[in-house]
Design a protein with these regions (language model features):
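Short-chain dehydrogenase/reductase
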Residues: 69, 73, 100-108, 138-147, ...
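Active-site Tyr-X1-5-Lys
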Residues: 100-127, 147-157
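Conserved Rossmann-fold NAD(P)-dependent oxidoreductase catalytic core, especially the SDR/UDP-sugar
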Residues: 51, 77-104, 120-124
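NAD(P)H-binding glycine-rich loop region in Rossmannoid oxidoreductase-like domains
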Residues: 37-70
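NAD(P)-cofactor binding segment of oxidoreductase domains
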Residues: 49, 63-89, 112-113
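Flexible, glycine-rich beta-alpha linker
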Residues: 96-102, 124-144, 168-173
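C-terminal substrate-binding subdomain of Rossmann-fold SDR/epimerase-dehydratase oxidoreductases
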Residues: 1, 148-262
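N-terminal Rossmann/SDR dinucleotide-binding element
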Residues: 1-48, 141
């Protein structure tokens, strides 16, 4: 929202305010509404719609699969039924290839809904989004590694757990691709201004994989803090490795893994 406003776009924001204690995008919107993507209140005519709504925590999806299909799939269908726009930009997931969790499967199903119902679309498969633009808009309890490690480095968390150390990777821990939120936001802006691609999907990442141990080591080097690292069993639903093979043409990388740890 902030970047779109800075580039002269009129921004209408929808959110459920689930994370109301820290979520305040109203200052970056010309209009703002507390609306759930599954609600009958969804409506309107727009030049483009950036669909970021949905449930996104893999372990939770294993416990509440029906809720993930309701929000991520039915919510997407509801959105496309109620709005009119020539361009839907959808935030899908890098988990889509292995489909090892209800979360991943719900996102793939939502992709299919968009391909069937949208007049024009750009489907982005987000890899691990990290970092800030210098303003704290982090929502709720952290579920992603870099933010968890940052909390441990700042003393707000007493440990960081590594879930699985016996994977077939260079150091036995899972490997992920990370993209800074600033680079991701610029890619979305570029896509809005370029128009729909109507291709199966595009990848938003960095084309570089980092293991869990490598990320934690980088956090320690950047912050100068030693983390209390605990090795734990593998976690159901985790992919061994997830790294971009071909980046979206809309991505220009300006930030490093070190920037994400600041």
């Amino acid at each position: 929202c902030k970047l779109l406003k800075e580039h002269g776009h009129t921004v209408i924001g929808w959110d459920t305010e689930i994370h109301n204690e820290t979520n305040d995008i109203t200052g970056y919107c010309d209009e703002y509404y507390n609306i759930d993507v599954t609600s009958r209140a969804v409506c309107g005519i727009y030049d483009a719609v950036v669909h970021l709504a949905g449930r996104s925590v893999v372990p939770q999806s294993l416990i509440e699969p029906t809720e993930y299909y309701r929000v991520n799939v039915m919510g997407t269908a509801n959105l496309l039924e109620k709005i009119s726009t020539p361009h839907v930009l959808f935030a899908s997931t890098s988990s889509a290839w292995e489909m090892a969790s209800p979360y991943a499967r719900s996102k793939v199903a939502a992709e299919d809904v968009i391909k069937e119902k949208a007049d024009g679309y750009t489907i982005f498969r987000f890899f691990n989004v990290s970092g800030t633009d210098g303003v704290n808009h982090q929502l709720g309890d952290p579920t992603h590694l870099i933010r968890i490690a940052a909390e441990a480095a700042s003393g707000r968390r007493d440990k960081v757990e590594i879930y699985g150390t016996d994977y077939e990777t260079r150091d036995g821990t899972c490997v992920r691709d990370y993209i800074h939120v600033v680079d991701l936001s610029n890619a979305i802006l570029n896509a809005i201004e370029s128009g729909p691609t109507n291709t199966p999907y595009e990848c938003l990442g960095s084309n570089t994989g980092y293991s869990v141990r490598e990320v934690l080591q980088t956090m320690q080097e950047v912050t100068g803090k030693k983390l209390n690292i605990i090795e734990a069993p593998r976690r159901e639903g985790d992919a061994v490795s997830s790294v971009v093979d071909t980046l979206s043409k809309h991505v220009t990388l300006t930030k490093s893994i070190e920037d994400m740890c600041l």
